[in-house]
Amino acid sequence: MPIKTIFVPLSDAEGAAKTLNAAIGLAEGFGAAVNVVHLRADPTQALGDFVGESVSPQLVEEVLTQAEKRATAIAAAARKAYDAAAKTAKGVKLSYSESTINSDVAVETQGRLSDIVVVRRASGTRDVGARVVAEAALMGTGRPVLVLPTTPPAKIGTSVVIAWNDSLEASKAVNAALPFLTRATRVSVISANAESAIDQKGIIAYLGTHGVKARGVSVKAGADAGKAIVSAATRAKANLLVMGAYSHSRVREMIFGGVTEHALSSARLPILLVH
């Protein structure tokens, strides 16, 4: 499926400029539109720390006031980043809006009406906003999610590494990545073998039917397949890693599998994930 609509949810202003510029760069290459939605925080969420405690009305009012000021400042910064990025866009249709509903719902609703979702990687364990957005996009949209590192490369998808293990998730990821793969100048299929080698002939032949010439590479996984894959992608000088997202879901909480978690936390290149 061609990429014609790119969705960029912004939970805050951190990294917004780089995320937007990367999305616009993709849109220019694919001839796509970019839909940006700022997910404005609900000030009442700031009261969560006081649940079960006896607090004065004055303290509640003060907490809400400060939370609203912070939300307003973040919204202004996000809009400023969008306006600056929009000025550099060349022939790209852009739209910007602000959502005050639950961020999960907003991401899922808009993401399902897009061809790909572009988000930034969480900068650490305390970067809850970015983590929530990425999880909602992966678990609730049914769309491929492009997770960007802190500093995205100037070009994304010219040199691609596919993490292949013959799984359903990996198969979905490859299919979703075809718009990138058919434009790439170099494609490598990497399998991290723990015990027995994974047959890559089938996936390489499949890619060939789409005009994609790929080479197969096998690496020893050892005790950490995620580390082996990321290291191999780095050695290949890839600017895009394609992989399935492995997880265990508990109601609305997502627990990533080891390979996915390592890639998300340590890879310094964009990762296209499909759950």
PLM feature segments, named:
Residues T125-R126, A194-I198, A221-A223, S249-R250:
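Short, small-residue-enriched loops and turns at beta-alpha junctions
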Residues Q58-A76:
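A short acidic, glycine-rich active-site loop
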Residues G25, A81-A84, T109, A136, ...:
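Alpha-helical scaffolding segments of alpha/beta enzyme cores, especially the outer helices
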Residues M1-E62, G140-R143, T150, I156-K220, ...:
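Small/aliphatic-rich secondary-structure junction motif
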Residues L20-A22, V105-P153, T234-H275:
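Gly/Ser-rich helix-loop-strand patches that form or flank binding pockets
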Residues M1-P2, G15, A41-T44, K69, ...:
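Structural beta-alpha unit
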Residues F50-G52, V161-I162, V230-A233, G257-G258:
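Short low-complexity, flexible loop/linker segments enriched in glycine and/or proline
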